[in-house]
Curated annotation (Swiss-Prot):
<keyword id="KW-0813">Transport</keyword>
<dbReference type="GO" id="GO:0016020">
    <property type="term" value="C:membrane"/>
</dbReference>
<keyword id="KW-0472">Membrane</keyword>
<feature type="topological domain" description="Cytoplasmic">
    <location>
        <begin position="24"/>
        <end position="72"/>
    </location>
</feature>
<dbReference type="GO" id="GO:0044167">
    <property type="term" value="C:host cell endoplasmic reticulum membrane"/>
</dbReference>
<dbReference type="GO" id="GO:0046740">
    <property type="term" value="P:transport of virus in host, cell to cell"/>
</dbReference>
<protein>
    <recommendedName>
        <fullName>Movement protein TGBp3</fullName>
    </recommendedName>
</protein>
<keyword id="KW-1043">Host membrane</keyword>
<dbReference type="Pfam" id="PF02495">
    <property type="entry name" value="TGBp3"/>
</dbReference>
<keyword id="KW-1133">Transmembrane helix</keyword>
<comment type="similarity">
    <text>Belongs to the Tymovirales TGBp3 protein family.</text>
</comment>
<keyword id="KW-0916">Viral movement protein</keyword>
<dbReference type="InterPro" id="IPR003411">
    <property type="entry name" value="TGBp3"/>
</dbReference>
<comment type="function">
    <text>Plays a role in viral cell-to-cell propagation, by facilitating genome transport to neighboring plant cells through plasmosdesmata. May induce the formation of granular vesicles derived from the Endoplasmic reticulum, which align on actin filaments.</text>
</comment>
<keyword id="KW-1038">Host endoplasmic reticulum</keyword>
<feature type="topological domain" description="Lumenal">
    <location>
        <begin position="1"/>
        <end position="2"/>
    </location>
</feature>
<keyword id="KW-0812">Transmembrane</keyword>
Length: 72
């Protein structure tokens, strides 16, 4: 893929991460989950398009919006 597409994907990932952090400022245990997903997005680059549904499902477990056990 082109560099510009990768930059767009990166920018969208950063924007989403900032939005999620804003919504979860009182849940410090969720920061590491967000950082891991952000790093995953950067590393996977162009493959991110296929992984978006999987990442979103990981971010929304049935029991709670964020599961601190992911960080252990």
């Amino acid at each position: 893929m082109s560099l510009s597409f990768s930059l767009i994907v990166f920018a969208v990932g950063v924007a989403v991460s900032i939005g999620v952090l804003t919504l979860t400022t009182q849940q410090s245990s969720s920061y590491c989950l967000i950082l891991v997903d952000g790093a995953k997005a950067v590393v996977e680059g162009c493959h991110l398009r296929q992984d978006i549904p999987a990442i979103l499902s990981e971010l929304k477990p049935a029991s709670s919006p964020f599961n601190p056990l992911f960080c252990s």
